[in-house]
Design a protein with these regions (language model features):
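Cyclic nucleotide-binding regulatory module and flanking cytosolic helices
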Residues: 1-33, 37-38, 82-83, 87-90, ...
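A short hydrophobic beta-strand segment most commonly corresponding to one strand
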Residues: 104-114
């Protein structure tokens, strides 16, 4: 059985990070663990993305509504999953979808301040972040 430490190291943004570096991060960065029941909202569309939200377990639905409100698209994702890392920076820093737990979900949240002040100092974190944000952006573009 994995410990919480092992589980966190398996998250996509932290994969490849040396355990010593992760221990150093834990000393400086406050992690907010949140447990949600099925049906509870994790993040709302058109609200500021000011933290990274990692799903540790469970499943979520992501519903995106067209700008004219005529239609919406719902997709499902299972943990491990990072909610909209591309929305943390850039010109549009609001969530583009509404995220709702479809099962019980455990998540960990890290503030944007912690990301910019501590996590981006680690090359492996920067590379993982760029790869994940790029992959999600490319995936969204291919759906157009």
């Amino acid at each position: 059985m994995d410990t919480m430490f092992d589980t966190l190291l398996q998250l996509p943004l932290l994969q490849g990070l040396a355990p010593e570096d992760f221990t150093s991060i834990l000393e400086k960065v406050k992690l907010h663990f949140v447990k949600l029941k099925a049906g509870e909202t994790i993040a709302r569309a058109n609200t500021p993305c000011n933290e990274l939200i990692f799903l540790l377990n469970g499943e979520v639905s992501a519903t995106t509504t067209s700008s004219d409100g005529i239609y919406s698209l719902t997709e499902f994702a299972q943990a491990p999953y990072l909610i909209e890392p591309q929305s943390l920076f850039g010109m549009r820093t609001d969530y583009t979808a509404k995220y709702v737990a479809t099962t019980e979900v455990n998540s960990v949240r890290v503030s944007k301040t912690a990301v910019t002040g501590h996590l981006l100092k680690y090359e492996i974190f920067r590379l993982n972040y760029l790869n994940i944000a790029s992959s999600q952006s490319q995936s969204l573009h291919s759906k157009l």
